[in-house]
């Protein structure tokens, strides 16, 4: 299947694996790209050295194009951009709103720029900067998310910009791909569906929690930004807690990261992105990585936060990335044939 996305980045199928922190490493990104989709390394939760090693790890596994996701507000964002350019990364994506100078540098070096947005005005802004495409995530999506459903947000963005639009939030099968194409998108991006594959490095015990899950909630207790996560006793305790738990979690992250309290507070304040946050939320924003890492790396579902889209309630298997992508494309072809039938 050829779309504006496949033509732009050189992948075989219009399917993107999103850059999920502590989930999308070299193994998952390479498996996705090798299967014909576009795999994206989640470098926002990596050091520069780890990011460079992950890029090398993908290169060792596949010659297919792939992307790297970074936080453009990070102190070392410019350094990361130079690494991506030097290593010949095909696609740059952004966990949060990119800085224009980073976009200009990447585009000048021939890197395809694809930021993620959650509102039409944000899509219009980055399109005016000259980005190559946008991923637009509706409220069904996991992690940082907005209040508008994909079915309402997607057509708004498609109508508002003249660049390829990739749909995210609520997608998991071929029917969704066809629906996104009908709305005017050039492909779909999936996070939770790729998290629940055999190629994902998420611990098996955590995958079992996802497969058994039936509910998510949107909380601001993680970092002050609306965050869709699995509903767990730990998350419900975060919803009830205030400064004390933030300080306790912050102390743990301080030990792991080596940051001083002053550095943690500066990090938390930077992650506010102009919002008014309580001190508890500032500290939570600074130690968000430890909450994600606890579950996604250490396997502590009881002490961590597990970002998840609403699709988690309908997922019940762990296919390989190749099996997943081939299934989605087969389903899409079947649906399109049915629609073409008299």
Placement of each model-derived feature along the sequence:
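Conserved active-site-proximal phosphate/metal-binding subdomains
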Residues: 150-162, 172-342
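Active-site entrance/lid segments in N-terminal catalytic domains of soluble metabolic enzymes
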Residues: 1-164
């Amino acid at each position: 299947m050829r779309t504006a996305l496949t033509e732009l980045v050189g992948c075989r199928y219009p399917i993107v694996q999103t850059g999920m922190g502590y989930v999308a490493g070299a193994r998952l990104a390479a498996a996705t790209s090798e299967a014909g989709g576009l795999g994206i390394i989640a470098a926002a939760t990596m050091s520069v050295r780890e990011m460079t090693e992950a890029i090398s790890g993908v290169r060792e596994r596949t010659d297919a194009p792939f992307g790297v996701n970074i936080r453009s507000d990070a102190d070392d964002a410019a350094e990361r951009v130079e690494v991506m350019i030097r290593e010949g990364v095909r696609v740059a994506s952004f966990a949060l709103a990119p800085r224009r100078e980073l976009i200009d540098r990447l585009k000048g070096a021939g890197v395809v720029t694809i930021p993620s947005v959650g509102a039409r005005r944000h899509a219009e802004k980055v399109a005016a900067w000259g980005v190559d495409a946008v991923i637009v995530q509706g409220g069904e999506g996991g992690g940082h998310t907005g209040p508008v459903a994909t079915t309402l947000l997607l057509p708004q963005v498609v109508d508002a910009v003249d660049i390829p639009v990739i749909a995210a939030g609520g997608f998991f099968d071929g029917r969704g791909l066809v629906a996104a194409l009908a709305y005017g998108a050039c492909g779909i991006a999936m996070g939770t569906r790729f998290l629940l594959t055999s190629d994902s490095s998420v611990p098996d015990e955590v995958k079992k929690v996802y497969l058994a899950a039936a509910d998510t909630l949107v909380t601001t207790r993680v970092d002050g930004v609306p965050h869709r996560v699995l509903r767990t006793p730990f998350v419900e305790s975060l919803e009830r807690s205030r400064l004390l738990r933030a300080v306790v979690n912050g102390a743990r992250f301080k030990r792991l990261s080596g940051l001083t309290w002053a550095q943690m507070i500066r990090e938390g304040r930077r992650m506010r992105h102009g919002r008014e946050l309580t001190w508890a939320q500032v500290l939570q924003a600074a130690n968000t990585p430890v909450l994600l890492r606890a579950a996604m790396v250490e396997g502590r579902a009881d002490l961590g936060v597990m970002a998840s889209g609403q699709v988690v309630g309908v997922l019940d298997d762990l296919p390989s990335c190749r099996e997943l992508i081939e299934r989605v494309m087969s389903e899409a072809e079947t649906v399109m044939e049915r629609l073409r039938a008299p």
